[in-house]
Amino acid sequence: MKKEFEVISRIIQNNKRVLDIGCGDGTLMEYLKRNQHNDVRGLEPQKDLVQKCIAKGLSVIEGDAEKELIQFPKKSFDYVVLSQTLQVFLNPEEVLNQLLRIGKQAIVTIPNFGYWKVRLHLLFKGTMPITKNLPNQWYNTPNLHMCTIQEFVDFCKKKEIKIEKSMCLTNEKISEITNKNMTYKNIFSQLGIFLIQ
């Protein structure tokens, strides 16, 4: 299991209701169900990945989160997980609003467009960077709204979204993001991980 999922699983308590949006092949869901006894559901737009999840015995529906989340009742989950998916939505603000409506808490992870390798690539090559967390060319990327860790934190403050925990991942190492180290983490972190409500 990738390090990001390990961090997410440590945030989520046992025996809780969890919705994983953009759940992929169900790796995180499977772990949360088997090891933490969580009641886990998934929402995934790709039919082949939905079929992989179902083959693992996971409860997943095929659908577009921007259209389907409105159908979930208010506070119907303890946690809603959105892992490296926020940037692909046409309206990420509305998706965040829906996460916070249907979940008591949400865990959002974002690839950090402020990472120093991304900055240098843009500066010296003048082209969109390709990294571990941003593996696509500009013309075939699903990413529409890239942001930095700092921008996400600023957005949450502006919208009065409470950040309960903020961490970052760099080269498989996890560390906490604080007001004092924000500038440093915004430059040297590949991924931001946030627990919000």
Model-derived features: positions:
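Class I SAM-dependent methyltransferase SAM/SAH-binding core
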Residues: 31-68
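Conserved SAM/SAH-binding loop
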Residues: 25
